[in-house]
Amino acid sequence: SEGNSGELNPGDVQWMTAGRGIIHCEEPHEDFLKTGGRTHGFQIWVNLPAEHKMMAPRYQEVPASESPTVEENGVSARIIAGECMGVSSSIDTKIPITLIHVKMEKGSRLIQKIDSALNGMIYVFGGSIIIENKISVKKHPMAFGLGAKQNIVDGELALLSEGDEIKIHSTSESEFLILAGPELNEPIERYGPFVMNTKEEIHQAFLDYQNGTLAK
């Protein structure tokens, strides 16, 4: 909605805060459309508390070359938000958020501190890991298993129990995301691309979009 544009390359991060409204579009690069191939990425939505929902929209972009990264004992962690092994992200998330992209060699271990006030999860998208905490595991859209010290494999999501750290052991070369954030304890209404606190706010967002005032 501001006429800005940019390119995201492998490992780059774009943190968009929609705030009071922004019109945006993400699509494959024209060269990729011509040559074809495979790519993957993650689009993760963070629900801001009511006090921040109408803040000014903004983008924070961090190229891969500037992304805080730490490597230690077979573990490589890229800190998109939050902190890992003493290294912190520079992204302003407004509320406490942890988002870490981790790669582990087979047999390596990681202990990640998580604020006990946050809800945490791990999504594995390569290899397998053992999480030495009590967790519930989403193996497919309609099934959860519950237990401790479970093997989590490619495509599975582990919801973490209460505690202030996660103990992870990689049983193969693995790649996953560690995510955590606060429980807002606020009402939530969602419709289409809009996430607000009340139906009235959703209705107003649609009116603003139709009137051309959403991103003004």
What would you call each of these model-derived segments?
Residues 1-216:
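Jelly-roll (double-stranded beta-helix
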